[in-house]
Amino acid sequence: MSSFAVNILENPRLSSLPSPCFVLEEELLQQNLAIFERLQQSAPIEVMLALKGFALFPCFPWLRSGLAGASASSLWEARLAAEEFGKEVHVYAPTYRPDDLPAIIPLASHITFNSLGQWHRYRESLKNTAVKAGLRINPEYSPVQTDLYNPCVSGSRLGVQAAMLAGNLPSGITGFLSHNLCESDHLALEKTLGQIEKLFGEYLPQIEWLNLGGGHLMTSQGYDMDYAIAVIGEFHQRHPHLRLIMEPGSAIAWQTGFLLSTVEDLIETPEFTHAMLDVSFTAHMPDCLEMPYRPEVRGARVPQTGDTVYRLGGSSCLAGDFLGDYAFDQPLQVGDRLIFEDMMHYTMVKTTTFNGVHHPAIGCLRRSGEFELWRTFGYEDYRNRLG
């Protein structure tokens, strides 16, 4: 739990927060932004916000001052970036629809293609435009152990392997995008740069920019920023003509807010007690089930012998919509509020209205300690998606 975070159970100004609710903490976001500002001041690299991980646009005015722009993976993300963030918009998608690309071109400064086939299909569309075209490359290295999140898994559909280029960089390609990390450290950054030089080094003199993608968890404890700055600087010394870019998503929103929920029922079984909540893991925190991982709950701990063991039950009818196990210092009661920590990245951008479950509101805890409610959802939001 952050030192800034306020215990909502003891603060009357915050006890009236709606439940469920995603709550961004402004102070923590600003602290993360300062880390990336330091990076850009100390190393020859520019940082973009990856909207696929964090697209909470009411806070874009704060981020705009310290970042170079935003990266998008679809027409709608590109439009959001252009309309709400401004500055440069870099677009990459695994495939482009023929009716989307003409709409993307006026919004984007850079468009990256996933395959040689996509580039050859659409290259004429970029003629007589100011858009810089790129290729996504596959460096054939990723430290990610979970295949669901590993873009370099054997047979990956993402990116061009060096063998596919066969020594010939297509005319018109001005840069490369390499996205092979996920919540990774400074050593993975170093290994990635080495792989790019090893497999694609012959093409680096022919391009203008290199985008190192996302997955650089520079805002986590244990990330050696000085080491990363040195690695980036040394790479740039070897390739001084290259404009270096990265586009973190999770790292910008890392540990900057929580999801508030309420205990609605308690179901006792011989093995454990189900604490039934007004949130759904499958609908509101899908990465918890997909990865899977056990999210931190404020005030909870791993059960020890003699503890009452709680399994947290989601609000949907999916049998597997639960997580556990947890223990608390005091027995839970119906009406208690639970806080899931670090729920700003890859949550709001992935939520669904599966089963018609109530979608969490969205708000912000400002530096002043005041809470601002930014968005609520109702029946019409569920209904209007379906017809």
From Swiss-Prot:
Cofactors named for this entry: pyridoxal 5'-phosphate
Residues bearing PTM N6-(pyridoxal phosphate)lysine: K52
Deleted gene: phenotype: Deletion of the gene leads to substantial accumulation of agmatine and CAPA, and lack of APA and spermidine.
Pathway(s) where this gene product acts: Amine and polyamine biosynthesis; spermidine biosynthesis
A biological process from GO: nor-spermidine biosynthetic process
InterPro entries reported for this sequence: Ala_racemase/Decarboxylase_C (IPR009006), De-COase2_C (IPR022643), Nsp_de-COase (IPR005730), PLP-binding_barrel (IPR029066)
Keyword match Manganese: no
Keywords: Decarboxylase, Lyase, Pyridoxal phosphate, Spermidine biosynthesis
GO molecular-function term, one example from the UniProt record: diaminopimelate decarboxylase activity
Coiled-coil ranges (or none): none
Catalytic activity, EC: 4.1.1.127
Reaction(s) catalysed (UniProt annotation): N(1)-[(S)-3-amino-3-carboxypropyl]agmatine + H(+) = N(1)-(3-aminopropyl)agmatine + CO2
Function: Decarboxylase involved in the biosynthesis of spermidine via the carboxyaminopropylagmatine (CAPA) pathway. Catalyzes the decarboxylation of CAPA to form aminopropylagmatine (APA). Can also decarboxylate carboxyspermidine and carboxynorspermidine, but not ornithine, arginine, lysine and meso-diaminopimelate.
PANTHER family the record matches: CARBOXYNORSPERMIDINE_CARBOXYSPERMIDINE DECARBOXYLASE (PTHR43727:SF1), DIAMINOPIMELATE DECARBOXYLASE (PTHR43727)
Family: Belongs to the Orn/Lys/Arg decarboxylase class-II family.
Listed name of the protein: Carboxyaminopropylagmatine decarboxylase
